[in-house]
């Protein structure tokens, strides 16, 4: 019988890799919490309407969503991104009526796209969202928090910040019209996908990955020439705060985000070490989305980090870490000693709840078990053989210092472990 393999673009995370993921996720969670952000969790599956209403023309909705009918005949989709679901959850749970929540979440997203390095059909994001605040100061807080991630992970020198301001609705309409007029004169040089975007959402053309289109856009009008005064002052204040924080950045007037709901501030952190999949974090303001999804008008801003890409970047610089926190490796030689090891292990956890213990259940040779104990990274080995069982003691060996074995009563072992 043939074996069943994982679906294309869906990847397993091995136990060793999971340690690296846990290390990274813990770093991100700790920093988000240090800024006063609270965790929120919401479903992987939502009504398709949630995404079509918020991103009608985005490629994610038109080309990449996993959409199907449930047994009740309702159209549902695996979440392709987290912001719409987070907004829906905030509205549903009445989080926005009296509070201005600052939230974080992480988990898998799903897009049916061509798998490649740094891009999978199931991928993972760590995200932060802020509701009820519209100010350069909160935009700066999110950007500075993301900068702190890189400092903590040791990658600040290989990642750069780009920002733009998309202005108000009038700005975007005026600029879109000018962009369409410019590109219509280049129509023979436009591929089918660009021609489609020219009709549906011209600003999305700025996010093209085609070198030919990017070359054309070098002579296109700039949104800076259409920006409204309020947005201009808003951006100046934001840049002033970032300057005072000694944060390096580049204003990129071609920067847009891949989703349709963004306005005003947008930003990305990019690296040159991962080829075409260069964006590690992307975010921006979405001040109309809450209202579009059925809530009362509420400004908002957020960002998402692609965890697969971030792990690739850390590995590229040999910075990925994990903590093999194994304290005790139990070595046993008989079924009776296995039974005693299990009992001792439970007693140890009663006294030291956070101690990490692994029992070798294979009844292998002493040489084999000691090799596995060394390889496990454990700090110490506890040995139970017939001699130990008869004397009601446990043999203790420090695997770090390689000192001689000691024979200890359980009470003395506890004292030693607590010192």
Predicted regions located by residue number:
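TRNA-recognition modules of translation machinery and tRNA-sensing kinases, especially anticodon-binding
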Residues: 1-419
């Amino acid at each position: 019988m043939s074996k069943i393999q994982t679906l294309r673009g869906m990847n397993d995370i091995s136990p060793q890799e999971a340690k690296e993921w846990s290390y990274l996720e813990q770093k991100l969670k700790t920093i988000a919490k240090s800024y006063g952000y609270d965790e929120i969790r919401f479903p992987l599956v939502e009504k398709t309407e949630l995404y079509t209403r918020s991103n009608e023309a985005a490629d994610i909705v038109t080309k990449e969503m996993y959409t199907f009918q449930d047994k009740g005949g309702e159209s549902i989709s695996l979440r392709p991104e987290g912001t719409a679901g987070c907004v829906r959850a905030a509205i549903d749970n009445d989080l926005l009526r009296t509070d201005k929540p600052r939230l974080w979440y992480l988990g898998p997203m799903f897009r049916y796209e061509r798998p490649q390095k740094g891009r999978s059909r199931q991928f993972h994001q760590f995200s932060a969202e802020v509701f009820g605040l519209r100010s350069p100061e909160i935009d700066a807080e999110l950007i500075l928090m993301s900068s702190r991630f890189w400092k903590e992970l040791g990658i600040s020198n290989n990642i750069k910040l780009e920002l733009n301001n998309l202005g108000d609705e009038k700005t975007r309409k005026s600029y879109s019209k000018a962009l369409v007029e410019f590109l219509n004169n280049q129509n023979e040089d436009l591929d089918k996908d660009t021609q489609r975007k020219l009709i549906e959402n011209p600003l999305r053309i700025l996010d093209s990955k085609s070198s030919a289109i990017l070359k054309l856009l070098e002579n296109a009008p700039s949104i800076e020439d259409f920006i409204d005064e309020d947005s201009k002052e808003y951006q100046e204040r934001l840049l002033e705060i970032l300057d005072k924080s000694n944060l390096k950045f580049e204003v990129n007037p071609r920067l847009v985000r891949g989703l349709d709901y963004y306005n005003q501030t947008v930003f990305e952190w990019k690296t040159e070490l991962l080829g075409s999949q260069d964006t590690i974090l992307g975010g921006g303001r979405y001040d109309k989305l809450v209202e579009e999804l059925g809530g009362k008008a509420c400004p908002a801003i957020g960002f998402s980090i692609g965890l697969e890409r971030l792990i690739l970047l850390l590995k590229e610089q040999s910075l990925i870490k994990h903590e093999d926190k194994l304290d005790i490796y139990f070595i046993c030689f008989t079924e009776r000693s296995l039974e005693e090891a299990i009992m001792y292990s439970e007693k140890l956890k009663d006294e030291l709840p956070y101690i990490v213990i692994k029992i070798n259940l294979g009844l292998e040779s002493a040489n084999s078990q000691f090799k596995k104990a060394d390889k496990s990274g454990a700090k110490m080995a506890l040995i139970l053989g017939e001699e130990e069982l008869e004397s009601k003691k446990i043999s203790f060996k420090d695997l770090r210092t390689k000192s001689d074995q000691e024979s200890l009563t359980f009470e003395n072992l506890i004292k030693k472990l607590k010192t």
